[in-house]
């Protein structure tokens, strides 16, 4: 009798897990359908966004470029200067130092972690199983007055101080239209280590048949955040290869 109860419990647990996975996949299917279709997203070769970030009342122009082959960068325009951040050319990750304005390569660990991000163009959930990711429907949750589905996404492990750590994000999908309105994840390093980072998305608009959020915020959960307004999005932009290259003059200085 005990054996029968144990088997029944196992079957129930397995059935519940399968139903949960199917429900999470159904939510994603609705999401992709509502924003333009999975195949249309997969056909993208690149995205270029022009935006403005509001930081302490100051509007700072921001340009974001992401390409299908993994190359990407952000360009901040501040006091008439262009400051490149998070530039990845496929091998090297580098940024301009805000104080010296010189280009500096990132440490090996940061570069390896950044490389993992290239798997997520143009969307983390596309072909998630092939990437080795897992998803789980955690239930429902109200975010800023909106009822949402909470989906847990587990990506490839990150390396933090030489140790592998699970990379987990929680996505909150609006129950009415199935688009994500918030993403939460634990900060793994720096002064805010252990705190929860939250990104919010709203004002979805169509660009060449695909819907993107044109209003975003980034900050700590239940804390201050920096609003970002997208002014334009260009799909499949033409970007020169040298745009991502670590500056030659810096390379020459290292040789001398």
Predicted regions and their residues:
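Gly/Pro-enriched, hydrophobic low-complexity segments
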Residues: 79, 147-244
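A short, sequence-level motif marking secondary-structure junctions
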Residues: 64-71, 89-91, 110-111, 203-205, ...
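N-terminal mature ectodomain segment of secretory-pathway/periplasmic proteins
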Residues: 26-101, 136-137, 142
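Hydrophobic alpha-helical segments, especially N-terminal targeting/anchoring helices
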Residues: 17, 66, 141, 173-174, ...
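Short Pro/Gly-enriched beta-strand edge/turn motifs at strand-loop
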Residues: 47, 118-122, 183-185, 199
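Flexible, processing/modification-adjacent segments and terminal tails
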Residues: 22-27, 33, 92-163, 190-192, ...
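Bacterial Sec-dependent N-terminal signal peptides
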Residues: 1-24
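A generic structural signal for short beta-strands and their flanking turns/coil linkers
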Residues: 45-47, 131, 167-169
